[in-house]
């Protein structure tokens, strides 16, 4: 297994594991945050280089879906990681919607987007 990836014995969904391994291969240190046992309490997904990040892996290329990713992530972390590799037809328009939403967000301070196996970072 990759030395940059610590799973803490947490069973990840395939998309989550794929994202973690992708980032680890890019040199990021990824640690899975152990989920809370408290009902209705959501934890962020990862520590990435020591910072808390929430991962969203949308599967639909719709503005509403992308908006929901921001709203849900903001409740868990100020850092959002969006992996678009599972969206069929993700294109420049998809990225434009995401970047525009990020620019107007008061709660999300950092954004990383994985699209076409490229990592894009915004602050």
Sequence positions of predicted segments:
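Metal-dependent nuclease catalytic core centered on acidic motifs
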Residues: 1-29, 58-123
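A short acidic/basic microdomain associated with nuclease active sites
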Residues: 26-39, 44-45
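Conserved catalytic cores of phosphodiester-cleaving nucleases, focusing on short active-site segments
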Residues: 46-59
């Amino acid at each position: 297994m990759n030395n940059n990836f610590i799973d803490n014995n947490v069973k990840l969904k395939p998309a989550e594991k794929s994202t973690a391994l992708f980032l680890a291969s890019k040199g990021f240190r990824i640690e899975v945050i152990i989920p809370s046992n408290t009902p209705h309490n959501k934890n962020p997904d990862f520590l990435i280089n020591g910072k808390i990040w929430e991962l969203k892996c949308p599967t639909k290329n719709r503005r509403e879906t992308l908006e929901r990713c921001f709203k849900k992530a903001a409740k868990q972390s100020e850092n959002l990681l969006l992996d678009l590799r599972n969206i069929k037809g993700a294109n420049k328009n998809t990225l434009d919607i995401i970047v525009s939403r990020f620019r107007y967000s008061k709660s999300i301070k950092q954004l990383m987007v994985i699209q076409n196996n490229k990592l894009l970072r915004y602050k």
